Amino acid sequence: MKQLILALTAIACAAPAMAQDAHPTLVVGTATASRGHKATGVIKVPAGVDAGYDIPVVVVHGAKPGPILAVVSGAHGTEYASILAVERLIDAVDPARLSGSLILVPLVNVASFERIIPHVNPTDNKSMNSRYPGDASGTQTDRASLAITREVVEKCDHLIDLHGGDLDENLRPYSYWTVTGNKAQDDFSRAMVLAFGLDHIIISADRPKDPKASRYLENTASTRGKPSFTAEAGRSGPVNPADVTALVNGVQHVLMHLKMLAGTAAPVARPVWIEKVVTVAADQGGMFWPAVDRDAHVVKGARIGVVTDYLHHQTQEVLAPESGLILFVRAVPSLKKGDTMANIGTIKK
C-alpha cells in the first residue's frame, strides 16, 4: 500500500511538469524535432497553375519549453547577407542550450536565388513579400505565401523577417517596427526591435490591419497578434561579413531578450526613429548617376543625382523631395521608368 501511495504521489508531482510542455515535438513542413534536437526538412509548395517547389526549413527544438521564434529570409533571393545570416544560425544555435524553439527558413525565393534575379520570383514575376497570407488557387508566389503562413506564421509566437539591399540597392542597415494599435503587443515588439540592435528604426504605422489582406510576412504575424518585426542589412550584391554578423548577433540578442538563450541583450541606447519614408522614383529611363551615398543627410531640394540618356546628355536632375536620411540609393546605373532611385527617411524629432 505504501509503495502504491508513493507511486501515485510521484505521478501527481510529475503531471504538472509534463502538462507544461505543449510541444514535446515540433513539426514544420517535413521537419520533425523532439525536445533537445534539431531537424531539417522542406515546406512543400504544391503545384498549381505553375510548378511547385520546396522551401528549406530547420527546426531547433530546445531542451526546455519556451516561446517559438521564427526567422525567415530570402523572400528576395539576391539579398544575400540576410540569407547567409540564417544559414549561420542553423549551426550557431544549440538546442541543448535553448528554452523554446527556433524555426529557421533561410531561402523562400529559391528561383530568384538560383537565377540571380532581384526583387521578384521569376516564375510569376511577383514579389514574395507582397502576397500574404497567400492563395491556394494563385500562382507560385501566392501558394508559397500560403504555405509559409500555415507552416511558419501559425506555428510561431514571434517572427523576424530578415532582408537587405538587393542587387541595385546601396542600403544602410535598419529595422521596421510595426505599430498595430495594440499597446501591449506594440510595446513587446518595440522591445524586441531595440534588443536586436540596429540603431535606425522605421516606424510603420500604415500597414494593412486586415489579417486576410496582410500583404507582408511580418505584418501577417503582427495582424495575428504575434509581436514581430523586420530587419535589413547588406547591399548591392557582394556580401560584407559585418552585415551578416549584425543580423546573426541581432537574432541571438532577441533570443536572449525572450529568455530563450542565457545572457543579456542591452537595448539600443540612442535609437534613431524614422517616422516616414519617401520614395524617389524615376519618371523616365536612362542612366542614373548618384550624387549622394547611403546614410547621407540631405535637405529638401538637395541634388540626389542626375539621369542621362545613353549619349550622356542630362535629362533630369533628381532632387530630394524632403529633408532626411538616405536609407538607400540606387547602386547601378541601369534605370527604367518607375525604378526607385532613393529612399529618404524623415527622422522623428
Name every feature range the model reports, one short phrase each.
Residues 19-349:
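Structured catalytic-domain cores with a bias toward divalent-metal coordination
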Residues 10-11:
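Short, linear, compositionally biased motifs with a strong N-terminal bias
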Residues 1-4:
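Positively charged n-region of N-terminal signal peptides that target proteins for export
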Residues 14-16:
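N-terminal signal peptide c-region/cleavage motif recognized by signal peptidases
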